[in-house]
Amino acid sequence: MEIDQCLLESLPLGQRQRLVKRMRCEQIKAYYEREKVFQKQEGPLKRSKPGKRQKVRFGLADMIQDAVIHHHDKEVLQLLKEGADPHTLVSSGGSLLHLCARYDNVFIAEVLIDRGVNVNHQDEDFWTPMHIACACDNPDIVLLLILAGANVFLQDVNGNIPLDYAVEGTESSAILLAYLDEKGVDLSSLRQIKLQRPLSMLTDVRHFLSSGGDVNEKNDDGVTLLHMACASGYKEVVLLLLEHGGDLNGTDDRYWTPLHLAAKYGQTTLVKLLLAHQANPHLVNCNGEKPSDIAASESIEEMLLKAEIAWEEKMKESPSAPSLAQEELYEILHDLPDLSSKLSPLVLPIAKQDSLLEKDIMFKDTTKGLCKQESQDGPPETSMTSNCGKPEQVQVMPPAPSDDLATLSELNDSSLLYEIQKRFGNDQIHTFIGDIFLLVNPFKELPIYSTMVSQMYLSPTGQRSPSLPPHLFSCAERAFHRLFQERKPQNIILSGERGSGKTQASKQIMKYLTSRASSSCTMFDSRLRHAIYIVEAFGHAKTTLNNVSSCLIQYWELQCCQRRKHITGARISTYMLEKSRVVAQPPGQGTFLIFSWLMDGLSSEEKCGLHLNNFCAHRYVSQGMREDVSTAEHSLNKERLAALKHALNVIGFSTLEVENLFVILSAILHIGDIQFTALTEADSAFVSDLQLLEQVAGMLQVSTDELASALTTDIQYFKGDVIIRRHTIQMAAFYRDLLAKSLYSRLFGFLINTVNCCLQNQDEYKSLQTLDIGILDIFGFEEFQKNEFEQLCVNLTNEKMHHYIQEVLFLQEQTECVQEGVAMETACSPGNQAGVLDFFFQKPSGFFSLLDEESQVIWSGEPNLPRKLQGLLESSNTNAVYSPVKDGNGNVAFKGQGAAFTVMHYAGRVMYEMGGAVERNKDSLSQNLLFVMKTSENVVISHLFQSKLSQTGSLISSYPSFKFGGHKSTLLSKRTASSMVGVNKNYLELSKLLKKKGTSTFLQRLERGEPATAASQLTKSLADITAKLQRGSPHFILCIKPNTSQLPGVFDHFYVSAQLQYLGVLGLVRLFRSGYPVRPSFEDFLSRYEPLASVLLGETKGQAAEERCRLVLQRCKLQGWQIGVHKVFLKYWHVDQLSDLWLQLQRKIVTCQKVIRGFLARQHLLQRMSIKQQEVTSIKSFLQSTEDMALKTYDALVIQNASDIAREHDRLRKEVHTAYHRNRQEEGTKRAEDQGGCRHVHSNSVPVPMVVDSLAQALTGPSTRPPSLHSVFSMDDSTGLPSPRKQPPPKPKRDPNTRLSASYEAVSACLSAAKDAAGEALTRPRPHSDDYSTMKKIPPRKPKRSPHTKLSGSYEEIWGPPRPSGTMGQGGRHQAPGTLSVQWARPDSVPQCTPQLPLHLPLPQGDYDDDAEPVYIEMVGNAARAGGSETDSPDQGESVYEEMKYILPEEGCGLGMLTFLPASPPLFLETRKAIILEAAEGNCQPSKDTCDIPPPFPNLLPHRPPLLVFPPTPVTRSPASDESPLTPLEVKKLPVLETNLKYPVQSEGSSPLSPQYSKAQKGDNDQLASPGFPVFNGPSRISPPATPPPPPGPPPAPCGPPPAPCGPPPAPCGPPPAPCGPPPAPCGPPPAPCGAASASCGVAPAPCRPPTHFAFPPESVLVTAAKALTNSDLPRTQPKPSSAPVPGPCSSFVKAPYSPGKTARADLRKTSSTFSPPSPYSPPNSRPLSSPLDELASLFNSGRSVLRRSAVGRRIREAEGFETNMNLSSRDEPSSSEMASETQDRNANNHGTQLSSSLSSDVTAENGNPVTNGLAEDDGCSRLCLSGMGTSSFQRNRESHTTQVIHQLRLSENESVALQELLDWRRKLCEAREGWQEALQHPEPRAPPPPPCKKPTLLKKPEGGSCTRLPSQLWDSSM
């Protein structure tokens, strides 16, 4: 069972331990099972005897490696004697010397070096023993390797040298730095050395590429140059390879890509670079690992995971989409430093952590032990935090002239003191001295540090505002801005006495900076406050000078991101903790605050558990315990302890860990109570209280015996020999106290490291370049009655800081002025600080050097320090340090056995007594005590003593700043090395080693071998602090203490004056007034003010830097500056003035950039708009070209249809001319019988609308064959596709209003000439299989008509009020058992957008008889779905009629289905298939056996359309909201040309053969109409109610102006459908017509889909005609916006324009008050006809010639704006125009007779015969006539009209000549027109034509008109 290491690390500790235990048990179990099986397989013969021991022999190489690891030195020597090879390699490729460096075996390492082992041997990762020794911090090995000649410049695979792995502050790092300094190598030259390898490879790659080498060339392992560069981190090489086309995703033989290698070896910059160049993060290597799986750090892993997500999104989108934000990536790549090679301190491996946790008996509940709790952002619950619950107060004093003391006119000590005292009395505690800030501690809380005040001091430049007084926030703001201006660290240095307010000032500065520049202000600010509180509890004490006195040096570093300019983290470094205060406190002073808080804050139960029942009895706290502590103080300490617990929880300590900390603190107190006694005469110490010792050992979790032995004896190991030495009582007490101090010091270091880990922002990438703002807070100068070694260290620290301030402010300026030749007005004496510091810190003759020498002595009975100190005082040349007591002869008299001296500090004279200084200086535990504490089972204690100390005495952090997963250094844990060392570890004496190797200058300067002492730690701490300060720019804050009693409002003049004098405030004022505090070099000046210089100087590259600086200062008009040899000398106010000028320039630059960016953005927008306009133009051009092709096809079909008509007429006239007059009644009966029976579908409930289709309704598309006459009549309005199922029924009755031909004889006679030229296409027989093609063309007898038969195309009748329930077909008693019913729903019973469509076709029962006239209805097909062309379909002209066959629907399609009632077997197919209503997009694909025929007829061939026969029905109308789920049904009326009809004026350019098509109204979307049922076209055509209709509402008009309403407006059905995209251009033969079957039939609840037909009219003039409402057959209601679907999604079938027959009119027969407003124009002679058969019967039964004279195309030949017939009706009654009745023809087709406003009172007729417009009757109940005549009058008008038409047709003698003339005129008309394409592009609406006034000449082209109808090339009679 194997588990990934990352998985174990992610689990909680408790769960992880349980999992590990279970794994361990399973492994043991599996091991025993395997052994049992193995024993069974071996058999009983091979089993060993029970008592016999087996011997296992290992090789010498394995044995010597194990001996080196476990420090078995004798065994190693024995193995080497036996022949073991000292050059043996380990598994990683390293030598035995690598193992010695790993496990700190110095003795064997020396032996191996003597045997000739290579000290520079490199393993597989190029690590040398020096690398490992530095990573594990083994300084003995480091020194040994250096002395053996190891090369410290060798680089590993990552390009790191050994120094890069040495943790800063460790002894190994100090040794290497000293060695490099000895060799003269500084850090800059070291960087050049590290860059030699990448520069060498860069040169080689350039040469290789210039010589024509392949950039992707691979070696034997498939590795390319890009692989090598990415693994090594050579950014320049990678960029070069990428520029030359390096393969980003190239793989080697193991399928590793360059991204894999860059991620594995932690090359963060290269990972970003590869991802920016579109490297694929999803590629896997041979192990199936992606780059994110092997990433070396969490930041790289997070980056790769984001890249993987972006790559997946890129794959989903277009290929051009980038995988990452390129701008962001390259922004990250700019100004990024190389990956820091400094590795963090190493951590315990997870196995070691689990091992220690299992041993830890303190943590019973390990599931909570080390689990970090969520950080709580609340402040510490203590009264020390001011104004927590109080409202925020703001108190800002107005500015005063004394805000800057440097501007005072009178300058002396008294004037300075007076100004400071005056300001202090006004609570103005802040004052400026130039750039130096002066702070006076008020000893009270002032409301000047609130958040509102901090907002007031925010500045864009960091300059002091003249309207605000001096403030601490202003100083912090200036430091923050200079951080980014100078791009170097800034240091804020606070100095002053104890109690002067340094710590509080530093806290306010950090609070301001974090709130101003923190990215997550609340979280970080809260953590920082809690961290400060923890440092205060463990690092501060209560003294007589200050209640919260700092006992250490704090250096806070706030890390700011240079690019984002916000704080990313913080870090605290502590120095010189007064750990001696734990065991002994000066008189009147207390111990650390934490012990006081524990005493007052712990409960009784907690004290009992910690054995602290009598807290005051402990020796460590009883010395400084104050007896006058009030009850309020105890309560306050309890609150402070609770706040401390909360703060520890915030930074990551759990409750159990906090309790463990308190156990350690309690153990420290109990350690101080251990007493020793002497039981023998040798004065050997023994523990007197064994019970207390056992109690302490239990708290420390160590062995009692081992602890007692470690306290009383000293055990040392030397080459296998054990040396034991007993301690005396004095020595035992010393080591006891030293253990307590060391334990507290290490615990404090552990807390500091935890705080630093918490304050590090883990979300920020560690490769981001940061700048630091340092805040230095040192313990203040102090003087007591008795000053000892601790006070000396404190005051020397202040002396050093004061000397640094004086050196920076005075000495450096004086020196630079002299060097640069600049005169300085005042000079400052350096004082005697240099002499004081030299006396103590000079080497090797300084006092601290003497003290360290004395501390090296193990134990001396007679101290030698007083004698040595006397010699030092006598030899010293300084007067700053001298002997305190001298007799009359001048001899020094010492007090007792101690040593004393007096020091003249900068702050005054202080005498120190050095008694016991040697013991206090010692700071190193014995090896025996150290080993006992390392073996503690307490995790924290074991960790504290296994960690090493830095040279400054701080605990080296074990928390990594960033992790490198899988990196080799994580395997080299120094703590595991220490823990594996046994008790027999041999410690080689350094002196012998040095004697053996010899002395050298390096060893003398190294000064190694000294024990860790307080003096050495102080020296190195001050050196470290000074080095940090020198790296940045200083900002000084001088803190003044007003009195020694800590009383608010008290100002002690003498005390304050003394502080002003030794701080040198007067000298600082004079310096800033006359000196030059700002002294940048020429290059730094030009770099800092580069924008200003570039604008002021322009192109001055040839000038010297000095001259350029001079010009800049002159043009800025500054005064008082000077130019030196290499530097510019400026006053402190010059910086603010230059910053103001730079800010003004920056604002102007920003304004210019804003304007330019706006201009570019507008240009980009215009470019995008231009591109979009081009796309729109291209689409329009495509649509126009498609429309032109459709028009060409349309014109060709017109000619072909005319030829077919002529041919067919010639044949029929010869066959049935005589029988036509004799047997019309018998033939009608015969035809009804042939099509009757079960094959006829008779509808008694659905008034089938008749659609008058003309030749203009032909398909717009190319045709392979000329369609026949019947195919012409079956053209679809909406799509223009010829449908084979939309053929007209045989011999329908004609309406005289149909203006094409009066009879087939007339058409045949007119088109006889075209028959000869048509070719084969015209001579083919007509492809009809029914009796229509074979019957004699004798008009059938007129069938009996029922007055209830309303088979009309008028919308008013279709959408009229519903019939009574007794006449509805859905009533069961009136329906035949074998009939098909169509059930319509009421429009008001369903929602407008989702009407119910239970569509049935009921057959009549009672009203049906054999004599009822059948109506033939054709099903509109959907052959061409989705606009595709069916090239392999049968010829569209070869159409054969076939009866309709119905099938039952079945579920499965989301669209609406047609449901049928039970019908007779002949009506249905055996296979029941779902009737799917095709949507416009054709989502539901047809079955493969249905070909082009829609689903209702799956077994019909494409050329055999179905034919429906409907019997008469008494129903007047159907509900307006229903639509049939069947494909639209159409009743075809054959067009009739009559000469006695008055035609309206033809629109310009319309076709002579398509008058009705030209009047087709286009809808809102300018789409063609569907000739199907109006009920299928949506619910917008509603019938008027029985009562007068309400005023019409606004009709939906999404695309164009709607026609004039002719009735109540349609109910809105939702928003109009979105227009569909452009259809593909037709290529090839036209597809089978889909017409209104799919595109315009809105019966299915399908989603909004665009239609498959063309979304544009066949001619642009039709748009004009439709919008202008010039046609006579326009609908009287608004066009429907959408069809009415069934409940479900709102059907949004794009509506198609409707044919002239589908017009909605009000049902005028219901009530006399129901009228529609007049339409602009309407044919006056239109009259009601019952059915197409009635029309034919009335036409052919007359027996006369149908064409009387050559006037068949009279309307077409009329010019625009004129009428052929000038005869007006004699009826001038006003009622005729007001009522504006609508008539019906004999087919029940309503034709509006309403006239325009100019002709409202005139009804035209031809030849002077007035035609009365009668109305149809409704069940004999009510009639409405315009003239007020009765039914008989209406009948006479109708009969007389028919008689006139037939009579005029019979008078025609030469019909063929007339029609031939018509065709010739049309051909010439189109050939003569050239710019017909341009005319299509201007479909503006036109005004209605004027009333007729003149009859034009026959076949004369109108003046000024242009035929935009047909191209000339299509007018060919041969087609």
UniProtKB/Swiss-Prot annotation:
Phosphorylated on tyrosine residues by FYN upon stimulation with CNTN5. Phosphorylation begins at 14 dpc, reaches a peak during perinatal days in brain, then gradually decreases. It comes from the Eukaryota. GO terms for cellular component: cytoplasm; myosin complex; nucleoplasm; perinuclear region of cytoplasm; plasma membrane. Its main location: cytoplasm. CDD domains: MYSc_Myo16. Residues 1338-1348 have a biased composition (Basic residues). The lineage of its organism: Eukaryota, Metazoa, Chordata, Craniata, Vertebrata. PANTHER family: UNCONVENTIONAL MYOSIN-XVI. Residues 1585-1633, 1717-1726 have a biased composition (Pro residues). It is found in: Cytoplasm. This is Unconventional myosin-XVI. It holds the Pfam family Ank_2.
